[in-house]
Amino acid sequence: KLSKAHEAQLKLKNRRLYQQRLAVDAIALIVNNKNALDELSISELRNILLGETKNWNEIEPSKLKQIQVVFDHKHSSIVKYMVDSITGGKPFAGEVYAQQSTRDVIDKVSKNKNTIGLIGVSWITPDLRGRNKSAAEYYQELQKNDTTTLDFNDNIKVLKIRRDDYPIAFKPYQAYIFSGEYPLYRSIYVATTAARGSLPHGFLTFLTGYVGQKIIQNTGVLPAAIQPRMVQVN
């Protein structure tokens, strides 16, 4: 969402701003499958990012060594979110490393049992295994109302996260992101100053309409206008 300062600049230029909430993205924490840890609290995550918790055995009994944190790149929006929302404005400290891409983060975690990775939840899809869907498959998925199923890489697992004031931890399933029970989420907005009836404004209308929102839902990101539902799989 544009800041108040940006909105003021547009107003000075007599530009009318059209801005709408498009989706809700979540940040997933991934670890190597050889790591026995299944969940983290927000305060435990904060202590890791600030370098106050340095080793895995400080969280629970473990033979693993020093914690290494990896994220996609040095200008990452994930880092900005973590600093703004988790560390209280304090910069990362300790063994924290920027990679070149999210794919590099996934590869690093899959090969290093001491590493924890920060990635966008939209990366946790069947495409993680390199599976290419046909146009027909995508069309069939658009007709479904089911919450996107998380398909995890064999070498990594996604941690559950819990709030400090709540005893239950949650994975980043769409329903839990929607309810706010999964705490690591952020809103995505679409904005334009183009006039109504123009191509850019039409694209905004498409993105926030039913078809656009269904497409967003199938990327693994939670659309703003479509309420997810949980489906039990036995």
Please place each PLM-identified region on the residue numbering.
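Glycine-rich phosphate-binding active-site loops on the catalytic face of alpha/beta enzymes
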Residues: L2
